[in-house]
Amino acid sequence: MAKLQVSLKARALRYLSAREHSRQELARKLARYAQEGDDIEALLDTLEAANFMSEARFSESLVNRRAARFGNSRILSELKSHNIDPDSLTEIKAALAQDEVARAREVWTRKFGVAASDANGRAKQMRFLLQRGFSHRAIQAAMRAKEENED
C-alpha cells in the first residue's frame, strides 16, 4: 500500500494545532518535507494572513510554558533565538520583570526548600538559579526573603 503524501499546508496545520510555533521554527520543520517548487515562505505568509500563526501568540505561549521554571534572561534568550520582534521583546521583558523574584523564590523552594547553612551551599543554590536565567537581584531577594521567613 502506498503512503499518502501530506501537503506542506496540512503538515503546517498539524504542527500548529499541537502548539504555537514561530515562523522560523515552522519553516525549519517544513523544509525537511519540501519538494522542488514548494514555496515555504509563501505558505507561511498565507498562514499568518489567515491568523493560523501569530508571533504574539507564540511569544505568549512560550512565556507561559517557561515562566514557572526559568528566569527572564533565559526566556528572553529563547525568544531572541526565534527571531521575535525587538519591540515585542521589550514589552515581554517589562511584564516578566514584575514577578521575577516570586518565580525565583518558587523555583528555589521546589528545588531546595531550606536555606543553606554554609557559604558553599548558598553558592550552589545561587548557581542553580543563575543557570535557570534568574538575575542576581532576583536571586538575592528570593533567598533573603526565604531566610527571613525561616527566622
Swiss-Prot record:
<protein>
    <recommendedName>
        <fullName>Regulatory protein RecX</fullName>
    </recommendedName>
</protein>
<comment type="similarity">
    <text>Belongs to the RecX family.</text>
</comment>
<comment type="function">
    <text>Modulates RecA activity.</text>
</comment>
<dbReference type="GO" id="GO:0005737">
    <property type="term" value="C:cytoplasm"/>
</dbReference>
<dbReference type="Pfam" id="PF21981">
    <property type="entry name" value="RecX_HTH3"/>
</dbReference>
<dbReference type="InterPro" id="IPR003783">
    <property type="entry name" value="Regulatory_RecX"/>
</dbReference>
<dbReference type="GO" id="GO:0006282">
    <property type="term" value="P:regulation of DNA repair"/>
</dbReference>
<dbReference type="InterPro" id="IPR036388">
    <property type="entry name" value="WH-like_DNA-bd_sf"/>
</dbReference>
<keyword id="KW-0963">Cytoplasm</keyword>
<dbReference type="InterPro" id="IPR053925">
    <property type="entry name" value="RecX_HTH_3rd"/>
</dbReference>
<dbReference type="Pfam" id="PF21982">
    <property type="entry name" value="RecX_HTH1"/>
</dbReference>
<dbReference type="InterPro" id="IPR053926">
    <property type="entry name" value="RecX_HTH_1st"/>
</dbReference>
